[in-house]
Amino acid sequence: MRGWKRIIGGALLVGLALLGQGRLSPAAADPCTALIGLVFGAAEVKSARAIAPPFRIASPYREETTEVDAPFCRVIGVIRPEAGSEITFEVWLPPAAQWNGRYEGVGNGGFAGSLVYRAMAEGMAAGYATSATDTGHGGAFDDARWAIGHPERVRDFGERAIHLTALAARAVIAVYYGRPAAWSYFSGCSDGGREALMEAERYPEDYDGIIAGAPAAPWVALTTGAVAGALALAAPGAALTLEKLDAIAAAAAAACAGGAEVIADPEACRFDPAALACTVRSAPGCLSPADLAALRFFYGGLTDREGHTLLPGFTPGSEREWRVWIVPVRPGELSFQRRLGTAFFADFIAEDPLWTPQGFDPPAAYAAAEAKYGAVLDATDPDLSRFAARGGRLILYHGWYDPAIPARATLDYFHAVQKAAGGPERAAAFVRLFMVPGMAHCGHGPGANAFGGVFGLPAPRRDAEHDVLAALDAWVREGRAPERLVATKYRNDDPAQGVAGETVLTPHP
């Protein structure tokens, strides 16, 4: 045996790495580079380097650059569970003196393809060893061509990569520090929220606590709805401009927020956009019949032929947040939803990069996609009994003004979890949901929206009242269930400009 060999039984990491023959020794001068060549199952460490600050790394996500101002060990590895699979993962390890003894895995967004370095750095700054994965491909967040002819890569993206990365990261942590992490958490938003629920539903032994923000859990319904919505906007006479979105949002707030900018209780809002319909004397910016038809779809959601809801609709008042996601900002551009939905049906389902939505029949398309990949991609199983039985804790959150994933989809899932658990009281022992007024997709929006989380703005304080990861940690380690979470509103959503206000969030309902 060359190097150190790691054996993982199920989801449990047992023992310490065995010292084998070759270049590694107990007296290795650099414990970071000594990790190179570590093998455990289908995973192997390819690179391990001690990083001295300042360290800067670019990420395709939101075209941001992450800066790390503390030393750490950067580990890069590859997992090949079957032919055609190549899952890249990274583990960032703070010095032993700064390690809090815990581990945080972080999720992705869109179709993944790269790592969210900012989330890894934020976790490490709080003392965690952190990990992330590209989920088995290097494509852009809206590019799914890697799926054509490769069902094994779809399996990696859907559920396998995030699970195997958890096992690999825990092995690396145990070898590097000489002891395993005492507690393991996962945090994700958007597709990362879907990944989080995959872990809770299918691999409950991987993590002690999980944060699932705005989860893209009903993946097939979301992508079907994205294409259907794009077609509604492309109908003759439809022209939902940015100016119209502003007018609709203002009218919704006037009807349901009493003059405030944010609708505090969208479930109680009864807003009819027909009040803005064009008449003979209407001002420019009024809504055409085709505009109103598109709005009815976006508010009402996706249904099957019998009228059963496949995906609930978006929240009145959120319309300003639809720009880019639902309505493109510039002529000739495609919205994020259209790009993601088209990529899914072209590359996952039709496996034809020239596919177009011409003749798209949403109920039929949904049924076909669900039959092919629903079991691999959807994280909608409400039975979390195995996760609860081993003491797992789950925090869900979702912004009411989310323009990418309808907030009511998470509400529906939460209610299903409550029912499966035997009622709200039993469910409250292991799962809490925080609905965030005025928050858009994973953050931002006009409401108070900063409490940490992947893609979110950092909390002003890393305590259990202001930071969602700290809240989860207190619940898991100390048994202090989160009864409130303070969301902060920074001026212009910029922490450097100071705090403009706060909103106290309480568990739903």
For the regions a language model picked out, list residue spans one by one:
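Cap/lid segment of the alpha/beta-hydrolase catalytic domain
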Residues: N100, G109-G178, T224-G225, T356-Y366, ...
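Bacterial N-terminal signal peptides
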Residues: G10-G20
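Catalytic-loop region of hydrolases
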Residues: L24-R102, Y117-R118, E261-I263, E267, ...
